[in-house]
Every structure is written in structure tokens, then in C-alpha cells.
């Protein structure tokens, strides 16, 4: 502060009638006066100081005034800090609000996507089911029924042809089974099952016949 203001020890009156020379002494440096040009009140005060002669008490008061202004400037410097902290708190609050909003938006988006997927699955048409994709019903030989498999019934023509084939061959090869299935409009499984049942029946008949022959032979031996 001493560089900007006249020293208080500087004599107010000069000997030898040199008081007129006092008004020519600049009270401020050139750099300080340049900075004061931006503030009209400060430059006005500077011109008044150059025109008039003041006592040391005035300089002290002026220094106090400027010191107060300096203190106010320090307070002014602290004021933006307060605003900065307030801005930071506001920014943090806005960030939290934005995070909450984004979470809510995410929840709503997820629910909307879920509903869209649900409705899309409902609106989607069913996959076409072709005859070869359906289960074969053994009751009538027609596809499309998924109930319990019933007993297969054969027509007289089918039964006659199968009996002829069984009379010549009790066991069928794969090629022969395919040929018969195409000729009688049956599946390979149906023909295979028919031959299995027919062989079981044939075995039972032969067993009964053999047991009857054995019993007859035993009776003839006892009688003889």
C-alpha cells in the first residue's frame, strides 16, 4: 500500500515558497493511474488529491478506506467461492435428479420393451404344422391325432396280402417291408408290428399243436 500512496512522513509544507511545486508531484505511479482509468470515481479522487494538499490524517483515512475496499475485495473474492460451492451442490443435486430420472426412464423403457415383446409373441402367427410333423395315429392310419394310440385295424385286402407274405416269409427284410408298405398304403411300423403279432400267434398255435401231438402219443403208448 505504501507504493500506491504518499508516505505519511512526507512534509506537508515546503520551505522557501516551494508549496506550488507540491502540486506537480504525482501521487500515483503511471501504472496505477492507468488502471484507475477504468474506474471514473478512482480517477476523480486522484485528480482531487493532485489539486489539493491534505494532511497525513487524510491519507490514513484514505488508506483505511482503500484498505476497507481491499478487505471488501477479499470478501468479494470469497463470495464467488460461496457461489461455487452452491453451484456445486446444485450441480450434484441436478446430477442425482438426472440419475433418478434415467433410472425411472430405464424402468419404463424395460417395461415397454417387455410389453412389446409380449404382444409381438401373441400377435405372431402360429407355425404351420405339416402332416409329416404330426404324430401318426395307429387307429386309422391318418395323421393329426395326438391321443392315445389305439388298436390298429386292417382291411380284408390288407390282411389277405399280409397273410400271403407271412406264409412265404415269416421275417421281412427292410426292402421288402418298404415295398409292402407302398403297396398296401401302410407304414413300415404297422407292417413290422403285424408280423410280430403274427409270429407270436403262430408260435402259440404250433405249441398247442405240438402239445396235442405229444399227449396223443402218450395216450397211444399207454393203450398199447
From Swiss-Prot:
Its main location: nucleus. Keywords: Developmental protein, DNA-binding, Homeobox, Nucleus, Transcription, Transcription regulation. SUPFAM superfamilies: Homeodomain-like. It comes from the Eukaryota. It is found in: Nucleus. One of its GO terms (cellular component) is nucleus. Residues 147-206 bind DNA. One of its GO terms (biological process) is anterior/posterior pattern specification. GO terms for molecular function: DNA-binding transcription factor activity, RNA polymerase II-specific; RNA polymerase II cis-regulatory region sequence-specific DNA binding. A motif (Antp-type hexapeptide) lies at residues 129-134. The keyword Membrane does not apply. Pfam families: Homeodomain (PF00046). Sequence-specific transcription factor which is part of a developmental regulatory system that provides cells with specific positional identities on the anterior-posterior axis. Belongs to the Antp homeobox family. This is Homeobox protein Hox-B6b. The lineage of its organism: Eukaryota, Metazoa, Chordata, Craniata, Vertebrata.
Amino acid at each position: 500500500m505504501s507504493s500506491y500512496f504518499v508516505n505519511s512522513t512526507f512534509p506537508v509544507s515546503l520551505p522557501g515558497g516551494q508549496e506550488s511545486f507540491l502540486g506537480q508531484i504525482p501521487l500515483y505511479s503511471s501504472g496505477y493511474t492507468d488502471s484507475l482509468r477504468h474506474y471514473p470515481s478512482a480517477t476523480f479522487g486522484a485528480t482531487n488529491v493532485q489539486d489539493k494538499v491534505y494532511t497525513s490524517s487524510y491519507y490514513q483515512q484514505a488508506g483505511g478506506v482503500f484498505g476497507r475496499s481491499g478487505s471488501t475485495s477479499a470478501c468479494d473474492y470469497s463470495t464467488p467461492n460461496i457461489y461455487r460451492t452452491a453451484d456445486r451442490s446444485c450441480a450434484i443435486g441436478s446430477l442425482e435428479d438426472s440419475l433418478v430420472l434415467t433410472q425411472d426412464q430405464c424402468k419404463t423403457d424395460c417395461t415397454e420393451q417387455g410389453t412389446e415383446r409380449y404382444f409381438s409373441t401373441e400377435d405372431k402367427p402360429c407355425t404351420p404344422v405339416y402332416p409329416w410333423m404330426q404324430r401318426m395315429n395307429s387307429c386309422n392310419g391318418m395323421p393329426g391325432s395326438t391321443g392315445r394310440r389305439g388298436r390298429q385295424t386292417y382291411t380284408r385286402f390288407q390282411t389277405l396280402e399280409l397273410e400271403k407274405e407271412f406264409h412265404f416269409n415269416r421275417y421281412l427284410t427292410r426292402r421288402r417291408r418298404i415295398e409292402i408298405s407302398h403297396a398296401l398304403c401302410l407304414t413300415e411300423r404297422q407292417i413290422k408290428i403285424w408280423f410280430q403279432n403274427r409270429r407270436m400267434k403262430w408260435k402259440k398255435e404250433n405249441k398247442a399243436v405240438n402239445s396235442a401231438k405229444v399227449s396223443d402219443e402218450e395216450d397211444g403208448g399207454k393203450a398199447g
